[in-house]
């Protein structure tokens, strides 16, 4: 499962694909439940339950978000929830261990350089930091700080809102392991069905982080329901196409505007 800075895939899609401008500033909170499962090239599956939470403050031109999650991971004890191979590297391990605890803290700030209402495309730039609050001894994280930069282009054409982004992440190196700095990219589109419903699809790619792993590749689809002006519900499914991604996953995200 990829607990990326867009933070959980469903949250990322939900927040990216909607062109909502808050002139006076607005605070929102999210709570989710996510499950994913994959073998990551091993003989045994890694199963991850996550309960992500986040707070986001947004104005017309910038936003800042802090997010974390509570994790329950059952795995051969060498794959983190990010799909990084940092344990024994023994892909034939037969014993699975269950660990749980708080995940890493992710903080991201985004600035709108180009307003999509005024220009051919909209352009957002983001800076991100992962603070290692997850227990590395339980393989819930790497125990190191990561930094990232991201640029995203988007525009609305009637009911369609396509987007494309590219990012680079500087990885901290756990002792004894060489995690590579990586490029990543995502492409997708949102479709507005009516005033209450929108749906969309997306594809995510990321360079491999270690010599033992592959490039991560995932496709996803989601449906978003606007309960009222203050509450939204998002349901998503995803499938992976490499040993660095889960075989499949699904989740539910609740968003409340304060």
Question: Which residues are covered by each model-predicted region?
Answer:
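Cleavable N-terminal export/targeting peptides
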Residues: 1-26
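Transmembrane beta-barrel domains of Gram-negative outer membranes and organellar outer membranes
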Residues: 22-173, 182-249, 253-258
